[in-house]
Amino acid sequence: MIEMRDLSKTFTVRVKAGRLRREKRTIAAVDGVSLSIGRGEMVGYIGPNGAGKSTTLKMLTGVLTPTSGEVSVCGLRPVPQRTALALRIGVVFGQRSQLWWDLPLRDSFRLLRAVYRVPAAEHEARLRRCCELLDLDGFLDIPVRQLSLGQRMRGELTAALLHGPEVLFLDEPTIGLDVVSKQAVRSFLGELGRTGDVTLVLTTHDLADIERLCHRLVVIDHGRVVHDGTIEQLHARYGSRRRLVADLDSPLPPGFVLPGATMTGTEADGHRVTFTLESITAGAAVAALVTAAQVRDLSVVEPDIEDVVARLYTDGRSAEGRSAEG
């Protein structure tokens, strides 16, 4: 469905090199990315600002021409076959609109039907399904400029799907949305993914979107893929530092040390302690605490995905710094 082989994109910029002199510098926005995404997959594509996410999406949709490497989407080459590709993909950018600002949603959808030459029966069936899942009926006849951000985003999703795309690219689809609107969008995308009819590629900084929707996670940093696998594999590789939180009847003895763990917090005059588990299992840590003090309550806190991804970014940049020094 989507194939990338050693895909790269560089940009030439001019940087100040003196009072009156500027020199050219080549920046690799995407650097040798190779990925294969199958039909019906829901893939999260994440990274810090400037990592190359949006540049990759623009190459996949035919907006940018790769500097080197190969890319195909739905068996088509995005740039030379951009018109044909547009009929087979849908794109939603959280900060850009494909709707007509002064027209009601219903009229925007009719125009898109004409643009994509969708048969009337297919158009109505898809629109009805989107209306049911996204609750559009209450604002179909309101001009887009008068819609709330959440309503407009639901309209954007519908507009991207009315021509029956095989691949849906989503760039920050929940940015700026309130809790209720986010939940509506996530529920809709989850239902869409369960059917397996559409391949979904999602880029976002809201990692809750990724955790709830995507089965596969690709992390990119400095233009290179640093992780490609399941969220569980990411946790296993970078999320081993669980925390043990214990409520005690009395403080731990002075100088207490838990081998393989670091005390990272103490509250309530020592009656609540937090340990970060490094090279000790939760079971062994619990046994040591129970031996040392009267324990009233215990909980093991798994690192959430934001902590795990932050650690991945930090480790990657530390490694890059060491490489540069060497």
Predicted features along the sequence, with ranges:
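Conserved catalytic motifs of ABC-family nucleotide-binding domains
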Residues: G164
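ABC transporter nucleotide-binding domain
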Residues: R186-T276
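Catalytic Walker B motif of ABC-type/P-loop ATPase nucleotide-binding domains
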Residues: L168-E172
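Conserved ABC ATPase "signature" region
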Residues: R110, A114, E122-F139
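Conserved ABC transporter NBD signature motif
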Residues: G69-R77, L85-A86
